[in-house]
């Protein structure tokens, strides 16, 4: 199992939240586990993106100390090991962890500490955020990505996350121009809540992977470009269903992309919020779209090819795929 698109603050399960609260002496606002889970995740009948986004509030209150961030990374990776995960890229926005005195660099170092001794091969992606007047904070994130950039075993790339429909991708040319100049590889959330133009802009910036990218289907020339240039799409089926990124899942474009030769991957996005695992994502695709074993293998090999890691590690991962 390979997961290239998983958010740290979207992977806080009930068990992890309780442990993080305990070690930080934080009192959680719930009467029982069911009530806590309702604060951390959405039901099958998620009504809107707004309902989905509310689930980030509580996890972020638990991720404002070095200890909290480090322990969260460790606990998440322990859970992923139990799920059979072989490689994962956890992403987070350092600027969202500075509400109680931490600097962005403190947050990055705390997350790096959490990787030590993990049973799962994990790398980190730092997220810039969409929003108003965030250029300074985002540029700091870019500089930190460069400072701690490694080929494997730490920070391996940069991302842009947040409200895509409200804050257009084109507004972040400065940040990703700097990232490109510094040689920091990046993926960008695009074509999730905004149209195909957002994907094109991200590719014009120099993104080698696209987070979600479901709305790329709106433009055939763009799809041809994506296929010809080996651009990777980090697709997250259940997240797209629950956030209403795709209103009609009967026309979910993953199979179309796969048949076109586009390098599609399957990921969890926010596994705790979506109440999902990578296994459940593949089960969903088998049940609803007739995904075959051969196609599943292709999706996993695509993920290995696209991973921000060394060729040596990729070869080790390929040898695990049967």
Regions found by a protein language model. Name each.
Residues 1-184, 193-198, 204, 208-209, ...:
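Metal-cofactor-binding active-site regions of metalloenzymes
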């Amino acid at each position: 199992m390979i997961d290239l698109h998983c958010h740290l603050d979207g992977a806080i399960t009930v068990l992890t939240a309780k442990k993080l609260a305990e070690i930080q002496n934080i009192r959680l606002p719930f009467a029982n586990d069911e009530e806590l889970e309702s604060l951390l995740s959405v039901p099958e009948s998620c009504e809107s993106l707004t309902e989905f986004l509310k689930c980030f509030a509580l996890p972020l209150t638990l991720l404002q100390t070095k200890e909290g961030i480090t322990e969260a990374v460790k606990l998440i990776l322990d859970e992923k090991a139990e799920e059979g995960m072989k490689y994962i890229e956890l992403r987070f926005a350092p600027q969202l962890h500075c509400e109680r005195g931490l600097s962005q660099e403190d947050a990055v170092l705390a997350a790096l500490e959490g990787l030590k001794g993990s049973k799962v091969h994990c790398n980190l992606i730092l997220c810039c955020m969409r929003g108003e007047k965030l250029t300074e904070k985002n540029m700091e994130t870019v500089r930190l990505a460069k400072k701690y950039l490694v080929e494997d075993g730490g920070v391996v790339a940069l991302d842009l996350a947040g409200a895509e429909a409200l804050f257009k991708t084109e507004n972040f040319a400065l940040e990703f121009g700097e990232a490109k100049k510094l040689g920091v590889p990046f993926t960008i959330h695009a074509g999730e809540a905004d149209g195909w133009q957002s994907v094109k802009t991200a590719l014009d910036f120099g993104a080698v992977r696209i987070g979600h990218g479901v709305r790329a289907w709106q433009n055939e020339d763009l799809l041809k470009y994506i296929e010809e240039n080996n651009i990777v799409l980090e697709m997250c089926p259940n997240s797209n269903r629950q956030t209403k990124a795709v209103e009609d899942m009967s026309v979910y474009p993953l199979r179309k992309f796969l048949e076109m030769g586009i390098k599609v991957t399957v990921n969890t996005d926010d596994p705790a919020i979506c109440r999902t695992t990578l296994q459940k994502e593949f089960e969903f695709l088998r049940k609803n779209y007739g995904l075959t074993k051969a196609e599943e293998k292709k999706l996993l090999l695509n993920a290995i090819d696209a991973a921000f890691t060394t060729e040596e590690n990729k070869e080790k991962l390929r040898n695990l795929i049967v």
